[in-house]
Amino acid sequence: MKKPVVSSGKVWFQPPNKFRREVKGNSPSLTVSDGHQLWIYYPNFKSAERYSLGKRSPLDSAIAAINSALNLEDVENTFTINARKIDDGYELELTPRTPSMKSVFRKLNLRLNNNLRAERTEMLQLNGDRIVTIYSNQTRAPLPASTFEFTPAPGTDVTTPLGR
């Protein structure tokens, strides 16, 4: 693919393993994790994928890694870190330490501003693809528990791709 796929949306994180990602545009999706289940909903297709977390799910380490990096919690135990100071913040190259994380991605580049807030991430996947996310309008306000809940609408086709 010569042209990158570009989308916009919103993302919320709550350590250690809760997040919500709403993607808008031609291919909208909603991804929600409450720490026990991960849902990916595709409104255009009225379909949802449900993944169980915990019990050594292959998704656990990926979710933990991203949350760890963005919240700078236990990041030194999760990644090998190569960092440098830049004019308006810091750039960190985070390489996964564990085999389970290494099976999900090669590295995560994280750009932080001087207030240590994430501005940009770039994840290098195993196949060479890159996922770049730019963060803005950040807040540390408390989030209601419902932010990390998902119930499929009636008529939604629900699958469990990992069979759990």
Sequence positions of predicted segments:
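A generic structural signal for short beta-strands and their flanking turns/coil linkers
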Residues: 7-9, 15-17, 34-36, 47, ...
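Beta-turn initiation residues at beta-strand->coil junctions
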Residues: 23-25, 42-44, 122-125
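Acidic/charged, solvent-exposed loop-and-adjacent secondary-structure segments enriched in E/D, K/R, S/T
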Residues: 40-67
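N-terminal mature ectodomain segment of secretory-pathway/periplasmic proteins
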Residues: 1-36, 40
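General beta-strand recognition
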Residues: 20, 32, 37-39, 49, ...
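Gly/Pro-enriched, hydrophobic low-complexity segments
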Residues: 76-163
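Short beta-strand segments
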Residues: 5-9, 29-31, 47-51, 106-108, ...
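Anionic-ligand binding region
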Residues: 64-82
